Amino acid sequence: MGVTVVSHPLVKHKLTIMRKKETSTASFRRLLKEISLLLCYEVTRNLELTTMSIETPLMPMEAPVLEGKKLVFASILRAGNGLLEGMLDLVPAARVAHIGLYRDHDTLQPIEYYFKAPEDIVNRLVIVVDPMLATANSAIAAIDKLKERGATNIRFLCLLAAPEGIERFTKAHPDVEVFTASIDECLDEKGYIVPGLGDAGDRMYGTK
């Protein structure tokens, strides 16, 4: 399906401020909400529409509305939750799934500790969210789990992606399109995206 880099000037500007090491936790969290709304606009751009009959104050008309079942936003915990607020502001009727994964700092492999998703996920568009696509191990594991539950229409949304992560992800899930605000240079020896923005979860919640 490929990779879409969202190159809107507001996205670029806000991402630059998020990258700055002196940006406060409060500002980082606010910017993450703002940029997630802009990214959500792009990832939902080609949703299918149908029409319904309505009446305006002046006359009846056939008007466009979204077709099919509501979206599912699937957050990879914990940092993925930072993207949810802005996305739910844009699509308040969306269902939400939570996938609890953390990365073993020695092996860089994901360890699952929680999974909760709507039961009728089979016929829904699922947008998986995580700020960083670094090694891609967590993203691959999350989508593996969603596919086990029957999801077939999946997209992945992140702030930053590493070329190594994109390569691994697209090999594992060639049917899942990736949307990102930036493709950075590479991964360092610890598996962090560089130049990156640090640990998104720590910066969002003020932890280390």
Swiss-Prot record:
What residues does 5-phospho-alpha-D-ribose 1-diphosphate bind to?
R78, R103, D130, P131, M132, L133, A134, T135, A136, N137, S138, D199
An example Gene Ontology biological process: UMP salvage
* Catalysis: reaction(s): UMP + diphosphate = 5-phospho-alpha-D-ribose 1-diphosphate + uracil
Output the CDD domains linked to this UniProt entry.
PRTases_typeI
Specify which residues bind uracil according to the UniProt entry for this protein.
I193, G198, D199, A200
Query: How does its record describe regulation of its activity?
Result: Allosterically activated by GTP.
Q: What is its EC number?
A: 2.4.2.9
GO function terms (MF aspect): GTP binding; magnesium ion binding; uracil phosphoribosyltransferase activity
> Looking at the record's lineage, which domain of life comes first?
Bacteria
User: Is Cytoplasm among this UniProt entry's keywords?
Assistant: no
The entry's keywords:
Allosteric enzyme, Glycosyltransferase, GTP-binding, Magnesium, Nucleotide-binding, Transferase
Q: Give a Pfam family name.
A: UPRTase
Whether Ion transport counts among this entry's keywords is: no
Names of required cofactors: Mg(2+)
Note accompanying the cofactor annotation: Binds 1 Mg(2+) ion per subunit. The magnesium is bound as Mg-PRPP.
Q: In which pathway does it act?
A: Pyrimidine metabolism; UMP biosynthesis via salvage pathway; UMP from uracil: step 1/1
Q: Which family does it belong to?
A: Belongs to the UPRTase family.
What function does the entry list? Answer: Catalyzes the conversion of uracil and 5-phospho-alpha-D-ribose 1-diphosphate (PRPP) to UMP and diphosphate.
The record's listing under PANTHER family reads:
ADENINE PHOSPHORIBOSYLTRANSFERASE, URACIL PHOSPHORIBOSYLTRANSFERASE, CHLOROPLASTIC
Q: What is this protein called?
A: Uracil phosphoribosyltransferase
Species this protein is from = Brucella abortus (strain S19)
Which gene holds the coding sequence for this protein? upp
